[in-house]
Amino acid sequence: MANIKSQKKRILTNEKARLRNNAVKSELKTAIRAVNTAVESADKDAAGTALVAASRKLDKAVSKGVIHKNNAANRKSAISKKVNAL
């Protein structure tokens, strides 16, 4: 355990950030999974809707600093390729 006051505060803020980041990453996985499910069922409309939602969540995660912008770009590219292949 830290003895320095600022480090005690950082431990608390880091824990809050970790929980928030895990929640956002979980939402991302769910959104991407929805796109993949729609693609597997060959449902073009659902896949397009899910793609827009997933892209939006990826962009929000980048703006919150949860993931890097290149990581989001790669993920969006991958799911877009799957949807466009329908």
Curated annotation (Swiss-Prot):
InterPro entries: Ribosomal_bS20, Ribosomal_bS20_sf. GO terms for cellular component: cytosol; small ribosomal subunit. GO terms for molecular function: small ribosomal subunit rRNA binding; structural constituent of ribosome. Signal peptide: none annotated. It comes from the Bacteria. Binds directly to 16S ribosomal RNA. Belongs to the bacterial ribosomal protein bS20 family. HAMAP family: Ribosomal_bS20 (MF_00500). This is Small ribosomal subunit protein bS20. It comes from Paenarthrobacter aurescens (strain TC1). The gene is rpsT.
